[in-house]
């Protein structure tokens, strides 16, 4: 029991799963539902952690804990940057694929990686 390593779900100790990426529907973890890199030091049901690495023990993970506001802001900014980076990559790939298909439609002899 504990965290499910999928990016969008958290598994609570009782086996119940819930979303973990939406800010409005954030899952509040009970005190026993934390792993070594996901701490709730004051047992408030809040995730006050920056996910920067894997820790081997509770004591190693404590070094990752920041004050709630800083951790929340840092986590949100990092998540925002990652999402925007992936959105840009996907947008460029789709734009290139559409352009290549349009060019291939105009010239039947043209072969691209998108039309193979």
UniProtKB/Swiss-Prot annotation:
Cited function: Stabilizes the manganese cluster which is the primary site of water splitting.
The UniProt GO MF terms for this protein read: oxygen evolving activity
**Alphabetized Gene3D superfamilies for the sequence:** photosynthetic oxygen evolving center domain (3.30.2050.10)
Gene Ontology CC entries for this record: chloroplast thylakoid membrane; photosystem II oxygen evolving complex
Give TM regions: none
Q: Main localization of the protein?
A: plastid
Gene behind this chain?
PSBO
Q: Does the keyword Chloroplast apply?
A: yes
Keywords attached to this entry: Chloroplast, Manganese, Membrane, Photosynthesis, Photosystem II, Plastid, Thylakoid
Could you state one GO biological process linked to this protein? Answer: photosystem II stabilization
For this entry, the protein name equals Putative oxygen-evolving enhancer protein 1
Subcellular location, record wording: Plastid, Chloroplast thylakoid membrane
* Family membership noted in the UniProt record: Belongs to the PsbO family.
What more the UniProt record tells us is:
On the 2D-gel the determined pI of this protein is: 5.7, its MW is: 35.1 kDa.
* Superkingdom of the organism of origin: Eukaryota
The answer to keyword Chloroplast applying to this record is yes
Which source organism? Pinus strobus (Eastern white pine)
